[in-house]
């Protein structure tokens, strides 16, 4: 199940390239590499926090960590354990994954990996401009340059996303819910994630 969730979070255009035999193009895909890096890094960190505290076996820790990381990252919404009772480190990692979401052109919701990567690279470029004001720096995704208008559009989208997140969180909080429940309710709703934390944890419902 974990494997199929991860596959569903991949840009479907890459499967067409795979069928067409364009393997080099797939290997150079920035979003795919970032997506898999997010998943693998999250799985390892969560498994390390679970091992010896929540689960005794290494295999068991990895299995639960991989499943839940895939579920949250791809916004599938499944849960095989009460991750609200997991160590704080594991919960923080899952919370971060709720913002990211799957790849563009996939079944996943959230901000999308390619937008996160582009925004990160744009931030790095802005820091480079501070050190080298006359420098020329370009954002490249999968070897292709990203125009400034696209980068600014992504920045605008992310700003609007966080604005709606803040607004929705406030509205849910006004109804008498705690901040954790309010925030993750808003986040899960915007990103189509499913379970969150607090009153909407994996063992509870909306």
Q: Where in this protein do the model-derived segments appear?
A:
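Membrane-proximal intracellular helices of multi-pass ion channels
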Residues: 1-206
């Amino acid at each position: 199940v974990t494997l199929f969730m991860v596959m569903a979070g991949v840009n479907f255009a890459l499967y067409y390239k795979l069928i067409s035999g364009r393997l080099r193009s797939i290997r150079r895909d920035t979003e795919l590499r970032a997506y898999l890096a997010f998943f693998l890094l999250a799985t390892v960190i969560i498994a390390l926090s679970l091992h010896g505290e929540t689960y005794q076996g290494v295999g068991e820790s990895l299995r639960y960590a991989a499943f839940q990381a895939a579920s949250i990252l791809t916004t599938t919404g499944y849960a095989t354990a009460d991750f609200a009772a997991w160590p704080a480190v594991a919960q923080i990692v899952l919370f971060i994954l709720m913002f990211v979401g799957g790849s563009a052109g996939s079944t996943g919701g959230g901000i999308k990996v390619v937008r996160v990567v582009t925004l990160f690279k744009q931030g790095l470029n802005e820091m480079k401009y501070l050190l080298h004001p006359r420098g020329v720096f370009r954002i490249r995704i999968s070897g292709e340059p990203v125009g400034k208008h696209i980068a600014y559009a992504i920045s605008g989208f992310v700003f609007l996303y966080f604005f709606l997140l803040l607004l929705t969180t406030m509205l849910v909080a006004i109804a008498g819910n705690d901040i954790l429940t309010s925030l993750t309710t808003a986040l899960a709703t915007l990103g189509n994630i499913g379970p969150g934390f607090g009153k909407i944890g994996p063992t509870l419902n909306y």
